[in-house]
Amino acid sequence: MLYYKLAVCAYGADTGRERRMTQRMKTVLGCIRRADADFSMIQPGDRIGVGVSGGKDSLLLLYAMALYRRFCKTPFTLEAITLDMGLRPFDVSGIQALCEQINVPYTVIPTQIAQVIFEIRKEKNPCALCAKMRRGALNDAARERGLNKLALGHHREDVIETLLLSLIYEGRLHTFHPNTYLSRSGITVIRPMVYLPEKHVIHVSRELNLPVVKSACKADGNTKRQEMKELLKNLTRTYPNLREYMLKALQNKEQYGLWNQKIAGIETTETEE
């Protein structure tokens, strides 16, 4: 069935439902192609690992990158990586089946992240530490498997929510960059879906019936990021174009665009925290 859907997206559709799916996938691929062009994400011979948590964002990224690989003029390889956080239940059989259907190698990496956070550290606000540990584990896994790039499924709203988090809780203007070289690990982290609105992620992942894995984290849905999501939703009711303008501000070369280094063709380098 997945191959059929890939073919529909690639070569056209007959029914109304197929045409809608084709158009939505074209939107997804168009956003990825634009990000790739703007931030020089993919180079010939890249070995790209896709971090797959089991959520809708990372699964759509995996699916879309497998399709993008067929049309991209730059040859690259893909591999999917999932971290076993130690949370239960943990069933990735659906992800495994998806990877087999789209011909992408799949690896599950065992970790003790949940044990460290909830049993040893007993963190009341675990998200920052969890994110740091997950980044480190993914970078290590990518390096050990001979990959040179790691693709993450952050979309447009993730970019804006991170900017709001930094502003409100840290007093600084900061968000993640679409293309970042990590000097310590030698891995480049790319985020091909930074231009893609979350509403498209929701629609397309449902349309494709991607095997979303429900999060087993006890902190899920009760985080500062969720607060920012609600804040952004409320602000958008008053200012409908807010999301577009905030993303535009990040790229504004005439002012202080936080992304203007890459727009100008200069690679951003960071060290892992």
What function would you assign to each model-found segment?
Residues T22, K26, L59, K132, ...:
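Electropositive phosphate-/nucleotide-binding environments in soluble metabolic enzymes
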